[in-house]
Amino acid sequence: MVELSLQDLRYTYNVLKEEALEACGKGDYLLVDSLLANISALVCQYNWRYADSELDDVIAAVSTHICPLDKCPAKLNPKRIVFFDKFGTTYVLAVQYLAALAKAGYEVLYVLCDHNQGITAQLTPIIEHLRPYRNITIVQMDNTKARFEKVRDIYRHICEYAPAKIFVHTSSYTTFNYVLPAIGGGITKYYIDLGDHNFWFGAGHVDYVLPYRQFGATIDYEKRGFKREQILLMPYYPCVVKREFVGFPVSTEGKVVLFTGGDYYKTIDKDNTYWTLLRELVVRYPNLLIFYAAKNISPKEQERLKTFLAERDYAERLVNIGFRADINEVFQHIDIFMGTCPMSGGLMTQYAAINHKPILQFYPDWLNTNNETEQVLDYNAQPSISTSDRSSFFTEAGKLINDEEYRKKRGDELYKAIIKPEEFDELLVRTITSNETQVPLRFYSIQYNALVEWWLMIDHSGMLDGLGYCYGLLKKYHSLNRVILKYQIRRAIRKIRRIVG
């Protein structure tokens, strides 16, 4: 079949990497910037590697060209911290860290850069969360400026502020990547490993990494080159934005309500496991009503979901409620949460726990080491939730659906297990004061090959077009190669099919 392969991805990556190394040697830093952005986008989509020390060296070389290394002060303020943030939203971890640092008495310079918008609807919730803290100063970089100009502006802010510590809360490739190598003089740098399953630049430019689960800690150790003593495990709690509950599209009276959903791609596998489980739950339990909240669904996938829901009576008892801004309030009005599979979502799992809701979770055997369910809840206890055995899954489902007291007991157990805000605050201060992990590390065997195969499976399902993306990246560098040939063959086949039928 004419499909994207791991070999195609590696070939494309290596071509772009060689171009970046050559451009850096020639001093063409704008081309380097463009190439690194493309490399980051490619690898983060398929996640077959997690770091690249040679490209980190390229970033350091460009940083030396951009930043005046003699400007930063030798004297630092031990109570000052700079916090880099690319997102500007409450959905990730900025609020948790910033609030803890502010409550501990640190002065914090909160630097927003590369975020999508200014102080608009997206940023309003995080600004409101931070408003009570007078010791947090917010600086928004001008995103209309060129990247390297923003690098100099951020570097100047750091030099003027003279912090003792810097926290980086960002994605794979941003303006901050060029700032980090230039920072020396005893400033301690921490990277919050938010996208632990993704490739990211800069592992060699920070002193410590802060993963939120054992999965991320294992990858940091095995794939990113961090020493054990550099890994400071920091579990987190979800930031709740209170909103008015807007209700459900159908009545829930007399029903047990199961809520499920998240990013659509997390439900894709060769066996249609997730959707098959939902279908069987509907068939087995007539009193069960399932609400599905979907995010990031393409028109093609929307049509596929619509077709699935139209089968038999599924449409009446398996209802798509779309994206919900009032997600916390949704959890308050349901009985059971079921995580997606083969990949689950940590934030949805935590929303269930803080609202005392029990969780159903299934992982297929071939991809169960990415388990995000127990790992985002196991601070005060070690809950047992997920299974790879269908019989055990439906046994637990039956108990949760038919026994209200059992539901409450299981939900209360999860609430007790998850880290609470005050525990997070205290843990963070102890961690960055000692620079030693306060939570024991438990490295374990990860199914790396299965993870790559799953990302390729998503591509082959039609949700992504990695072959077309690689073709677009390569055609300007090489007139003929295996990726371009495969793309052209696929295009010809599609054209013939349109003509024939």
Mark where each language-model region is.
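Short N-terminal targeting/anchoring amphipathic segment
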Residues: Q7-D8, I81-F84, Y155-Y173, F337-C341
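A short, active-site helix/loop in glycosyltransferases that binds the activated sugar's phosphate group
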Residues: V32, L36-R49, V206-Q230, R304-T307
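N-terminal subdomain of nucleotide-sugar transferases
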Residues: V2-R134
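Conserved catalytic-core segment of nucleotide-activated headgroup transferases in glycan assembly
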Residues: L93-A94, A100, A217-R312, E316-N320
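Catalytic binding pocket for nucleotide-activated donors in carbohydrate/polymer assembly enzymes
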Residues: I336, T340-I419
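Active-site-proximal region of nucleotide-activated glycan assembly enzymes
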Residues: G184-V241
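C-terminal amphipathic helix plus adjacent low-complexity
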Residues: V2-G27, T395-A397, N402-G501
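Conserved active-site histidine-acidic residue motif and adjacent donor-binding/catalytic loop
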Residues: T144-F148, L318-V330, S344
